């Protein structure tokens, strides 16, 4: 597999307005396999737009985006959807767990909606839950979990398809300091296992744990020391 998971080259994203709004301005970024990258920046800086482009939820106006060596910008919607389901896992600030479903059922839903084969689905979900240290909560409903455990369940769901890239949008925004630390420890473990992680955050505790940090301001990306 290619050494670079993410290769952005001169990416722009413009939105129609008067005058036009440039949310991303000639953004170039390379993220190698196994990297742990934090993206920081003020509100309205372009962080969410960048996440949407990286997650194949939005198309750049111009420029190139290669994911795992695949040029994505010219792909049709169906091909982009399949590539996203195969290569990208998402973790958000809100856990998006169904209250009436058990933890393992919530994790299994990732493959149901992704069109993956039914055979072995529960076993794969149990493996993902064990990977995030939640094997003792598989039959619990979400309301019996702590905030940190709910985020771990959401991370297990994101890991179900064996993604190359984990995209995290403010993953600790709803957690206290203890649960934040536990989630960050899990990120460290996943990185050691070779997973590529990109985290958008405004929390310094989160960004300082990453191996790399970039800042986006007015759509312009700058690498930080």
Regions found by a protein language model. Name each.
Residues 1-3, 225:
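Short, low-complexity, intrinsically disordered N-terminal peptides in bacterial proteins
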Residues 4-216:
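ABC family nucleotide-binding domain
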Residues 213-225:
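H-loop (His-switch) and adjacent beta-strand-loop-beta switch element
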């Amino acid at each position: 597999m290619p050494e670079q998971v993410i290769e952005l080259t001169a990416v722009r994203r413009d939105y129609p307005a008067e005058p036009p709004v440039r949310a991303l301005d000639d953004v170039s970024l390379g993220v190698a396999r196994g990297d742990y990258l934090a993206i920081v920046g003020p509100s309205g800086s372009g962080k969410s737009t960048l996440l949407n482009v990286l997650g194949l939820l939005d198309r750049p106006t111009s420029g190139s985006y290669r994911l795992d060596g695949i040029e994505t910008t010219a792909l049709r919607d169906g091909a982009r959807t399949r590539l996203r389901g195969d290569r990208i896992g998402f973790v958000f600030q809100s856990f998006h767990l169904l209250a009436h479903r058990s933890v393992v059922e919530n994790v299994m839903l990732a493959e149901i909606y992704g069109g993956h084969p039914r055979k072995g689905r529960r076993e794969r979900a149990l493996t993902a839950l064990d990977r995030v240290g939640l094997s003792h909560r598989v039959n619990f409903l979400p309301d019996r979990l702590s905030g940190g455990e709910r985020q771990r369940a959401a991370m297990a769901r994101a890991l179900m398809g064996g993604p190359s890239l984990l995209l995290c949008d403010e993953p600790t925004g709803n957690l206290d300091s203890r649960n934040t630390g536990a989630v960050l420890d899990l990120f460290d473990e996943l990185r050691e296992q070779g997973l590529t992680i990109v985290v958008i955050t405004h929390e310094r505790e989160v960004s300082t744990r990453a191996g790399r940090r970039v800042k986006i301001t007015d759509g312009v990306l700058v690498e930080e020391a």
